UniProtKB/Swiss-Prot annotation:
Enzyme Commission (EC) number: 3.1.-.-
InterPro entries: MetalPrtase_cat_dom_sf_prd, YbeY, YbeY_CS
Biological classification of the source: Bacteria, Pseudomonadati, Pseudomonadota, Alphaproteobacteria, Rickettsiales
Official protein name in the record: Endoribonuclease YbeY
PANTHER family the UniProt entry points to: ENDORIBONUCLEASE YBEY, CHLOROPLASTIC
Function statement: Single strand-specific metallo-endoribonuclease involved in late-stage 70S ribosome quality control and in maturation of the 3' terminus of the 16S rRNA.
GO cellular component terms given for this protein: cytoplasm
Cofactor(s) named in the record: Zn(2+)
BP-aspect Gene Ontology terms: rRNA processing
Tree of life domain: Bacteria
Length: 167
């Protein structure tokens, strides 16, 4: 079971009714099911903040020391790394619960990117959600090899939902 808490701090998000707990749960489940050790955990929790440029800028400055608005920020609750994901998940064998972390999405940046890239807002949001969940479970794109692995997973999951590759 995946428990999703959503905080909407910006009214524009309400225009996109498809972006809801059900969608977020479905996407999260589709990411996690690809990794065997997650099936041992009975309950996951994920916190979502749907916000605007001003708040994402503040968060980016506060937590990453970057003075720029961004599309999404991921705050993992665990020190996971996909290179040793299975050994790191061994501590979860005896746990029924895992808080994956927090994700903050910026409406204006995602909206502008979706227009520039000629995608629907919802499809771009889904891509950013998949990308963020992968970050929460230890994936990153700090080098070309890791970026290629992460992008391949994103493409695979997006295709499951009928969304073309963004790359």
């Amino acid at each position: 079971m995946i428990n999703v808490e959503i905080v909407r701090n910006y009214n524009k998000w309400r225009e996109h009714r498809k972006i809801n707990k059900g969608l977020i749960k479905k996407i999260t489940q589709n990411v996690l099911v690809r990794f065997d050790h997650f099936d041992k955990i009975k309950q996951f929790e994920l916190s979502i903040l749907l916000t605007n440029t001003a708040e994402i800028l503040t968060l980016n400055q506060q937590f990453r020391s970057i003075e720029k608005a961004t599309n999404v920020l991921s705050f993992p609750n665990n020190e996971l790394n996909w290179h040793n994901l299975y050994s790191k998940l061994e501590f979860l064998y005896y746990s029924d619960y895992m808080h994956l972390g927090d994700i903050a999405f910026c409406y204006e940046v995602i909206y502008n990117e979706s227009c520039e890239q000629q995608k629907t807002f919802e499809n771009h949001f889904i891509h950013m959600l998949i990308h963020s969940i992968l970050h929460l479970i230890g994936f990153d794109h700090q080098n070309d090899t890791d970026a290629n692995i992460m992008e391949s997973l994103e493409i695979e999951i997006l295709s499951y939902f009928g969304i073309p590759s963004p790359y």
